[in-house]
Design a protein with these regions (language model features):
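N-terminal periplasmic/intermembrane-space "pro-region" immediately following the signal or transit peptide
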Residues: 3, 19-65, 411
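Outer membrane beta-barrel
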Residues: 46-73, 78-215, 232-247, 326-338, ...
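Gram-negative outer-membrane beta-barrel proteins
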Residues: 68-74, 118-122, 147-151, 213-217, ...
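Transmembrane beta-barrel architecture of outer membranes
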Residues: 95, 124-126, 190-192, 233-237, ...
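Outer-membrane beta-barrel "beta-signal"
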Residues: 235-247, 362, 366, 371, ...
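Detector for outer-membrane/organellar transmembrane beta-barrel domains
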Residues: 239-347
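Outer membrane beta-barrel transmembrane domains
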Residues: 326-328, 334-367, 372-382
Length: 411
């Protein structure tokens, strides 16, 4: 195993050197690198401060979401038999983000954002700086999105639905306890360092090392693995995307851009070494396809996770997978219709049974597109389970009927 990791590291370093050799032109960074993963700033001057020379830029931004949600659960979908069928319903503030982004010295971009709608370590949503050695070789350090999954890498304020696919965000089911939070398919925000770049305006690569503890932890808490003492128990993640029509925007459809034609095909992989406090290691792989064509947006994505338990646990491996396809179309320049079909093997492949979750939605934009109304309805069905008990357990904590309306304001 140790020889395998050494070989992979050598191959990665070799690939990075080759990528750098393809792009030797020195170029000052431009405003397209001034990004925040919250709201799109492409082509928008807005409210900003800059020097006359343009080598320093400072842009504040904000995103506020207010939602109303109705969730109705089956009796079998409730964690307690005494709970009411209608639960987790009412009004909420999913996100209330205030941040600033910018550039300095024509080499460094930066971003800092706070989210008071969250608690604990998640109050600090992002804090990073990015050094652009050249377009094909950039280094980012701090707290930011890990390079895995189109659903998460999309700009937060430009998603097709107000809720991300459940196959990406809901935790898996295990027949035994862990020493840590049970994982989901996604890896989300984390603390770490990443090398990334764009080559020939068609190839994008991202390779990083992270804590693997997620958005809620802002401190160093990791150690070395038990089974492989030479390996730090961190998250190792990478993504490679091919964009045949040029650089792909992170939007899932925008009224600002109804005449574009962009496509992306990407593969990603991550290894969270003994992530659950030395209980299990999570290996994830993903494949994604996205296409924006004029008023159309289409995405299809699948992901697989293997949980390998440590020797002390004495448990067999468990495998899980999920996938979704979604499409959006601007019926008018301000009105976007949306459809999604989401599938989740939540209880592991050896148990059988799937959750299938179709959804329909609509987005409407007001006031120069700074105000956005999103509505959606999702149904949770189950199929292929061996017993009624398996069927009941697979849907625990997930509403049979979910309806959400959300207003979002950005600047």
């Amino acid at each position: 195993m140790k020889k395998l990791y050494i070989a992979l590291t050598a191959a990665l370093l070799s690939a990075t050197i080759q990528i750098q050799a393809q792009d030797t032109t020195k170029k000052e960074i431009d405003d397209k690198y001034v990004e925040n993963d919250v709201v799109s700033l492409a082509g928008k001057k807005g409210f900003s401060f800059s020097t006359k020379a343009g080598d320093f830029l400072f842009k504040p931004y904000a995103l506020v979401q207010a939602s109303a949600t109705y969730n109705r659960y089956d009796d079998q979908g409730l964690e307690s038999h005494y709970a009411k069928n209608v639960a987790n319903s009412g009004f909420a503030i999913p996100n209330a983000i205030l941040g600033f982004t910018g550039k300095a010295f024509n080499k460094v971009t930066f971003n800092l954002s706070l989210n008071p709608a969250k608690s604990g370590g998640a109050l600090l949503q992002q804090a990073w700086f990015d050094i652009a050695i050249k377009e094909s070789f950039r280094i980012r350090a701090g707290k930011f999105k890990t390079p895995f999954m189109h659903a998460y890498l999309s700009t937060l304020g430009e998603t097709l639905f107000p809720v991300l696919p459940y196959s990406a965000t809901q935790s898996i089911l295990l027949p035994y306890d862990l020493n840590y939070v049970i994982p989901s398919m996604s890896t989300g925000f984390d603390l770490g360092v990443m090398v990334h770049g764009l080559v020939n305006n068609k190839w994008e690569y991202q390779v990083g090392i992270f804590n693997g503890t997620g958005i809620d932890v802002n401190t160093a808490t990791k150690t070395n693995c038990d089974d492989h003492e030479w390996l730090p128990s961190l998250l190792y993640s990478g993504r490679l995307a091919f964009m045949p029509k040029g650089e792909m925007p992170n939007s899932q459809g925008s009224p600002e851009n109804l005449n574009d034609d962009k496509m992306s095909i990407a593969v990603s992989a991550s290894y969270n070494a003994e992530a659950e406090f030395l209980s299990a290691s999570d290996a994830r792989v993903g494949l994604e396809f996205t296409w924006i064509k004029n008023r159309w947006y289409f995405a299809a994505e699948g992901y697989f996770m293997n949980m390998h338990f440590t020797k002390i646990m004495q448990k067999p491996d468990k495998n899980f997978w999920g996938a979704y396809a979604q499409a959006g179309y601007f019926i008018t320049p301000k009105l976007q219709g949306a459809l999604k079909y989401d599938v989740f093997d939540r209880n592991a492949t050896d148990d059988g049974g799937l959750l299938n979750m179709p959804a329909v939605g609509m987005n409407y934009y007001f006031f120069n597109n700074n105000l956005k109304l999103q509505v959606m309805y999702q149904y949770m069905g189950r199929t292929g389970h061996a017993t009624q008990g398996d069927r009941d357990e697979d849907g625990i904590g997930i509403a049979r009927h979910m309806a959400t309306a959300m207003l979002q304001f950005t600047f």
